[in-house]
Swiss-Prot record:
The lineage of its organism: Eukaryota, Fungi, Dikarya, Basidiomycota, Agaricomycotina. The keyword Metal-binding applies. Residues 1-75, 126-146, 196-221, 286-315 are annotated as: Disordered. One of its GO terms (biological process) is gluconeogenesis. Residues 423-495 form the PAS domain. Keywords: Activator, DNA-binding, Gluconeogenesis, Metal-binding, Nucleus, Transcription, Transcription regulation, Zinc. Residues 196-210 have a biased composition (Pro residues). The gene is ERT1. InterPro entries: ERT1_acuK_gluconeogen_tf (IPR050335), PAS (IPR000014), PAS-like_dom_sf (IPR035965), PAS_13 (IPR056751), Zn2-C6_fun-type_DNA-bd_sf (IPR036864), Zn2Cys6_DnaBD (IPR001138). This is Transcription activator of gluconeogenesis ERT1. It comes from Coprinopsis cinerea (strain Okayama-7 / 130 / ATCC MYA-4618 / FGSC 9003) (Inky cap fungus). Residues 1-39 have a biased composition (Low complexity). Residues 126-136 have a biased composition (Basic and acidic residues).
């Protein structure tokens, strides 16, 4: 009988490709087995036993503190607290001992918060604050200014630099305006612009030996009205707050102010208060800066007087000025004239004109008659289209005119008419200096003032233009009338332009056209109503 050997294990299927030798297969298998059999390397952990004791440490170890830890002090001393340094509880502390200031080592003061204070401490804090407020600092002596002194005036003591401007030049009682605020403003301006030299000391009484005297007229005209202007204006040089100038020793400071401010007559001024002592003036209580110098119902009503001469009055009357011109006479010669000699009243031409305006204007001006005449005049000259253009222009500014006139009372309208008449006086004087053909009319077109040059240009007589009720659009050609009303409607309540320039054709009495360039400006009254129109023409040659 035969024994059967076991079947060998099946080989892996051969890969496609070239056949390999048995030696190569053995090498590959041996290399793979060696890779799988080798264990993976692990990082060795160093234990305290394995580490060498004598090796240097990688990092330096912290040095152990010698002695007990320093305890923080509950409260630092004053010097350590001020220097923001660490202190200890011992007194004197070690730091002060090292610095050699052990004798001054004291407890520092720590400020408590308000919510931590006790009631007693709160009361003490309030009392200390009230006491600090109650103690007012003593007033320091003010720096003193100085103005050069006239050589003819004796000086008994030197005056510091800033004294005179504070006590005399800036004295609000020097000038006789309605309020001391205006007096102070004018006195400062007078000091800045420079003051004229005072009059000769021979015309004034000798001053006391203990006081210096100064005269401060801001205008030469002051000497003509004040016989006491050359007398003493005393001021104390020990107290800049004391006012020593007589309250009624100066008249108005400018020529134009004579008609605006009340003033004493010479007889009144020479009789009252001329010999009052210095103490009586300095003892008067100072007024409030806005308080008037005199009550309105007690102000003297005498008109200003002039002692210059008859020539001044005739000059003013011939020119129709509201204010008299400055005199050529020197202040000293005028001040030496005694009161009552050559005393001639002011010209009454300007005053009479103003008084006549106040007496004549008793009711407001009726503007409705001017518009009624315009509505009657348009159909007689214009076609329908031109009439519509004029009416449309009137409709533009009519609502604004009514809205501004509604709140006005009867007194307001009378006041507006008085202002209008006064403006005509000023414009009449201005037109007399100009050679340009000029006409002034109301907003309705009624002519109020005509320059002679306009009469020469248009050959219209002055009596017919001003004496009768003549309207400016009656002198215009038709197209110029329409353009005028359209321009007036556009600029009656406009603030961007003050004057309107255009062309205009004027008509002579016989109907001959006069082409010219035309410029007119609209003036408004106190209530912003267009009340006056000023027109000027230049002929086109």
């Amino acid at each position: 009988m035969f024994a059967v050997a076991p079947r060998p294990a099946p080989l892996a299927p051969a890969q496609a490709g070239p056949s390999t030798s048995p030696q190569q297969t053995l090498k590959k298998s041996s290399s793979q087995s060696s890779i799988t059999s080798a264990p993976t390397k692990r990082r060795r952990t160093v234990t305290p036993e394995d580490s060498p004791q004598d090796s240097a440490p990688s990092q330096p170890q912290k040095k152990a503190r010698e002695g007990p830890k320093k305890k923080k002090a509950n409260r630092a001393c004053f010097h350590c607290q001020k220097a923001h340094l660490t202190c200890d509880d011992s007194r004197p502390c070690q730091r002060c001992i090292k610095r050699g200031i052990a004798n001054n080592c004291r407890e520092g003061h720590r400020k408590k918060a308000k919510y931590l204070l006790d009631d007693d401490e709160l009361e003490a804090l309030k009392r200390s604050k009230e006491g600090a407020k109650g103690k007012a600092p003593e007033p320091q002596p003010q720096p003193q200014l100085h103005q050069p002194v006239v050589a003819t005036m004796p000086i008994s003591e030197p005056v510091p630099q800033s004294e005179q401007l504070l006590t005399t030049a800036f004295d609000p009682t020097t000038f006789a305006f309605g309020s001391e605020a205006a007096n102070l403003e004018y006195s400062i301006l007078s000091a800045i612009l420079g003051n004229p030299s005072p009059p000769d000391s021979a015309s004034s009484p000798p001053p006391p030996p203990s006081q210096s005297h100064y005269s401060w007229p801001s205008d030469p005209l002051d000497f003509t009205a004040s016989p006491r202007l050359g007398t003493s204006f005393t001021s104390s040089y020990t107290d800049a707050q004391q006012l020593s100038i007589s309250s009624d020793s100066v008249l108005s400071t400018s020529p134009s102010a004579q008609f605006l401010n009340y003033s004493y007559s010479q007889q009144q001024r020479s009789d009252e208060g001329s010999d009052l002592p210095y103490s009586q003036y300095s003892a008067q209580a100072p007024l409030h800066p806005l308080q008037p110098r005199y009550p309105l119902d007690q102000r003297p009503r005498s008109p200003p007087t002039s002692t210059v001469g008859e020539k001044v009055s005739t000059d003013v009357a011939s020119r129709g000025l509201l204010t008299p011109p400055l005199s050529n006479a020197s202040p000293s010669s005028i001040a030496s004239v005694p009161p009552g000699v050559a005393e001639i009243p002011q010209p009454k031409s300007a005053v009479s004109h103003l008084q006549s305006i106040n007496d004549r204007v008793t009711k407001p001006y009726d503007y409705t008659e001017g518009y009624h005449f315009l509505m009657k005049h348009l159909p007689t000259r214009f076609e329908k289209n031109d009439i519509l253009r004029v009416v449309r222009a009137l409709a533009i500014f009519r609502p604004s005119l009514i809205a501004l006139q509604m709140p006005l009372s009867l007194d307001d309208e009378i006041f507006v008419e008085k202002c209008f008449q006064r403006s005509l006086l000023e414009l009449g004087k201005l037109i007399s200096y100009s050679g340009t053909p000029t006409v002034v009319w109301r907003r309705t077109g009624e002519i109020c003032l005509v320059a002679p040059e306009f009469c020469m240009l248009t050959e219209w007589p002055m009596e017919e233009l001003v004496g009768r009720r003549k309207y400016i659009y009656e002198l215009f050609e038709n197209q110029s009338v329409v353009e005028y009303w359209e321009n007036f409607a556009s600029h009656a309540f406009e603030n961007t332009t003050r004057s309107v320039y255009s062309h205009c054709v004027l008509l002579k009495p016989d109907g001959t056209p006069v082409p010219a360039t035309f410029c007119f400006s609209i003036r408004r009254d106190l209530f912003d109503l267009p009340s006056m129109v000023i027109g000027q023409w230049l002929p086109l040659l």
